[in-house]
Curated annotation (Swiss-Prot):
Protein name: tRNA pseudouridine synthase B
Organism lineage string: Bacteria, Pseudomonadati, Pseudomonadota, Gammaproteobacteria, Vibrionales
Pfam family, one: TruB-C_2
Broadest EC class assigned to this enzyme: isomerase
Task performed by this protein: Responsible for synthesis of pseudouridine from uracil-55 in the psi GC loop of transfer RNAs.
Family designation: Belongs to the pseudouridine synthase TruB family. Type 1 subfamily.
Assigned keywords, A-Z: Isomerase, tRNA processing
Domain of life: Bacteria
Species of the source: Vibrio atlanticus (strain LGP32)
Reactions catalysed: uridine(55) in tRNA = pseudouridine(55) in tRNA
Amino acid sequence: MARRRKGRPINGVILLDKPTGISSNDALQKVKRIYFAEKAGHTGALDPLATGMLPICLGEATKFSQFLLDSDKRYVVIAKLGERTNTSDSDGEVVETRDVNVTQEQLERCIASFKGETDQIPSMFSALKYQGKPLYEYARAGIEVPRESRKITVYSIELLRFEGDEVEMEVHCSKGTYIRTITDDLGEMLGCGAHVTMLRRTGVAKYPYDRMVTLEQLNEILEQAQAQEIAPKELLDPLLMPMDTAVEDLPEVNLNAELTDLVQHGMPVQVSGAPTEGTVRMTSGEEKLFVGVAQIAEDGRVAPKRLVVFRDEEPQA
């Protein structure tokens, strides 16, 4: 007997506005239940303290989540000067208190120094893994383990507000950048210590800020569907972004029906006008149905890497 699937095979990306106080995985599970999705995965964890854009991939879109993990991010952060915590945010314990004697000029100069490429050592209170366990589990046990520095790029960092001991900044950065670490480093540069009190992710890749939805809104839609006696998917599914938005920055290679059939069977194909190297997104026919992503092989052929598999009555969002 065929194994019964749990959930429906819905495809697409929902831009969740994660609330504060819950983990990214908790938020993911709530969205998965609301959509009754067979598969779901998020694209880069936010701390429980943090709010904002958490793209959640449903169904076949999970195959392309790595591209969003690797994409640029944007944040607005509020930091409190004068106090350093063991987690570099307000969820932790204050470990040091110092006077704040900082001028606007000093602050702007220190903030500007973070712009560009640099090496950053991840916080012990992060989800990075060491020997299979997240770093924060070691940290909570009072154990410090070695962490390698990682190359990050801060494309822009701007001071939005400086009032008393509170600093508000906007940051555009590469993947793997820890805003808590930047804040802690800033506090040390200023000689007074600092920690994050508010962190909001305002952008991932090129996804529009105004397409985010909250858990409250999703639950209200469920109630609305029940009141109207219609299937929830009729109201929920239009909120999904197409799954190829995760790879929209990749060069497009359009395939005819014959080539589409070959790549869907895992065969590399020769495509006139295709790039000579790198990763591409494949579309099919005049309607440009998203097929998947491919790598350009050494011989110039388009070699399928990750393919979309559609099943009967499966939405193609």
